Amino acid sequence: MSYILGTNLNSNKQVKIALTRIFGIGPKKAIQVCDQLGLSDTIKVNKLTKYQFDQILKIISQNYLVDSELKRVIQRDIKRLISIGCYRGFRHNAGLPLRGQRTHTNAKTCRKLRYVSIRS
């Protein structure tokens, strides 16, 4: 098992698939990182050298917001929406869908999550 940015990467998977385990790195960003390093699409994590790991870490940390930094930015944006009193802020506060989805019969998951977070 290999660790990059505090995330455990499965050593038997391809690099582009394993990188998607990092919060903030999706399939397209993982492919971009591999292309910047010139890595093959089929190379596995356990075949990478120490230098290649360092280069992956360098590229990700310089070019992308990932893991705790990204979570902090998302939380800050939500707090800003709540503080300015906009519609999306009210919906975040109430734990309801933000983007106009139907709530009469749907949106059970949002309300369940809200109930669990209030209860604990």
Swiss-Prot record:
One MF annotation (Gene Ontology) recorded for this entry: structural constituent of ribosome
Location in or out of the cell: Mitochondrion
GO cellular component terms attached to this protein's record: mitochondrion; ribonucleoprotein complex; ribosome
Biological-process GO terms, alphabetical: translation
Main location per the UniProt record: mitochondrion
InterPro entries hit by this protein: Rbsml_uS13_C (IPR027437), Ribosomal_uS13 (IPR001892), Ribosomal_uS13-like_H2TH (IPR010979), Ribosomal_uS13_CS (IPR018269)
Sorted UniProt keywords: Mitochondrion, Ribonucleoprotein, Ribosomal protein, RNA-binding, rRNA-binding
Listed PANTHER family: 30S RIBOSOMAL PROTEIN S13/40S RIBOSOMAL PROTEIN S18 (PTHR10871), SMALL RIBOSOMAL SUBUNIT PROTEIN US13M (PTHR10871:SF8)
Similarity field: Belongs to the universal ribosomal protein uS13 family.
Function, in words: Located at the top of the head of the small subunit, it contacts several helices of the 18S rRNA.
Assembly behavior: Part of the small ribosomal subunit.
HAMAP family: Ribosomal_uS13
Protein name: Small ribosomal subunit protein uS13m
Organism placement in taxonomy: Eukaryota, Viridiplantae, Streptophyta, Embryophyta, Marchantiophyta
